[in-house]
């Protein structure tokens, strides 16, 4: 049996600047199971994440560049359509890193069977997936956040940032949230109940703004953007404060990345700790996160919002819009229009 797979490929590398839809191509090819790749999967949901931008250049990074003309990759949830593997059955819902395509064939070691949950399956790409895990590990392992502390979160209207805000509130922290639109400010204030949210695009001087809204300073800054925002935050960190570097979305597409931080003296004077981390280094640390996040979700203490584009043809647009900040919460591409919910056995 063979089927046609539609997929997104990169037409050329993008060393600087924002990607354009013309940098991508929707292609098709015939696929079929064989002795080595003996499972056929149809994707239902594809995760769209900022880290993918780093794979669109030829520069050495923590993941290799996408191959020109071949299938791009990304996290996805799908359903087994055909299987010659004893461990997977038709209808099984699975997680893989073989996104950016509607169908694929693979071996069993490329799939993870999903556990039963009483919520939509795309939660495994959001609060129960890399999004939630990144927020959890960043806050507790690297940020060492404690109850009652004050935290600044940039890109707080995105998937990771909004999860960081809610975990910190659950811990009894004061949360200052920065985002790029009034709509996101409203969501952060009125639904997620952060202590203060602001649209950074409307702030003329971030350093003065930080002094005004948080005169005592920040214990922790969860940095998703880098650049000038990071430099401004350093001025208002408390002595022995911590800065966790999770992303640098403000610089990913810059044609001129600038000269770097000009206030490193404050890192010395304030005895700050600045630490970067990659969630890919923590795959073996999921159990405590999954237990706690599942409880928060069940208790309604973590809310998640999604921005959804339909069809593999719209995957390039979804990625470009993500980089332009047009998403609220998690950016997803919906491939299979059937709605799957995994139910726990009664």
Question: What does each model-found stretch correspond to?
Answer:
Residues 228-302, 335-346:
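Glycine-rich phosphate-binding loop and adjacent beta-alpha segment
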Residues 169-232, 280, 284:
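Adenosine-nucleotide cofactor-binding segment
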Residues 72-79, 90-155, 301:
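NAD(P)H dinucleotide-binding glycine-rich loop of Rossmann-like/cofactor-binding domains
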Residues 2-5, 301-308, 316-346:
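C-terminal capping/lid region of NAD(P)-dependent oxidoreductase domains
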Residues 157, 161, 165:
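N-terminal Rossmann NAD(P)H-binding glycine-rich loop of SDR-like oxidoreductase domains
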Residues 131-134, 159-160, 228-229:
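Hydrophobic/small residue at the entry helix of a nucleotide-binding pocket
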Residues 155-156, 225:
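NAD(P)H cofactor-binding loop motif with strongest signal on the N-terminal glycine-rich segment
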Residues 30-48, 56-100:
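Glycine-rich beta-strand-centered segment in the early N-terminal region that forms part
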């Amino acid at each position: 049996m063979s089927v046609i797979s539609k997929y997104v490929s990169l037409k050329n590398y993008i060393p600087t600047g924002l990607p354009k839809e013309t940098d991508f191509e929707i292609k098709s090819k015939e696929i079929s199971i064989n002795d080595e790749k003996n499972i056929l999967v149809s994707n239902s949901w594809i995760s769209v994440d900022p880290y993918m931008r780093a794979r669109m250049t030829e520069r050495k990074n923590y993941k290799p560049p996408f191959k020109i003309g071949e299938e791009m990759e990304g996290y996805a949830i799908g359903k087994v359509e055909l299987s010659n593997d004893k461990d997977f059955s038709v209808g099984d819902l699975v997680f893989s890193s073989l996104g950016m395509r509607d169908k694929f064939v693979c071996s069993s070691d490329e799939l993870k069977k999903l556990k039963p949950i009483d919520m939509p399956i795309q939660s495994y790409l959001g609060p129960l997936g890399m999004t939630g895990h990144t927020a959890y590990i960043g806050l507790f392992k690297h940020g060492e956040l404690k109850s009652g502390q004050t935290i600044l979160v940039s890109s707080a209207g995105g998937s990771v940032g909004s999860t960081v805000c809610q975990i910190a509130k659950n811990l009894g922290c004061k949360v200052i949230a920065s985002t790029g639109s009034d709509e996101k400010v409203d969501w952060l204030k009125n639904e997620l109940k952060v202590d203060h949210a602001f649209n950074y695009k409307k702030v003329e001087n971030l350093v003065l703004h930080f002094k005004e809204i948080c005169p005592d300073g920040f214990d922790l800054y969860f940095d998703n953007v880098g650049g000038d925002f990071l430099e401004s935050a350093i001025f208002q960190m408390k002595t022995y404060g911590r800065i966790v570097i999770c992303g640098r979305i403000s610089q990913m597409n810059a044609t001129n990345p600038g000269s770097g931080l000009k206030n490193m003296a404050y890192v010395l004077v304030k005895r700050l700790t600045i630490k970067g981390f990659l969630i890919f280094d923590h795959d073996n640390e999921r159990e405590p996160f999954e237990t706690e996040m599942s409880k928060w979700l069940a208790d309604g203490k973590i809310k998640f919002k999604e921005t959804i584009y339909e069809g593999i043809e719209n995957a390039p647009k979804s990625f470009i819009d993500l980089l332009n900040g047009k998403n609220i919460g998690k950016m997803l591409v919906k491939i299979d229009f059937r709605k799957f919910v995994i139910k726990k056995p009664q």
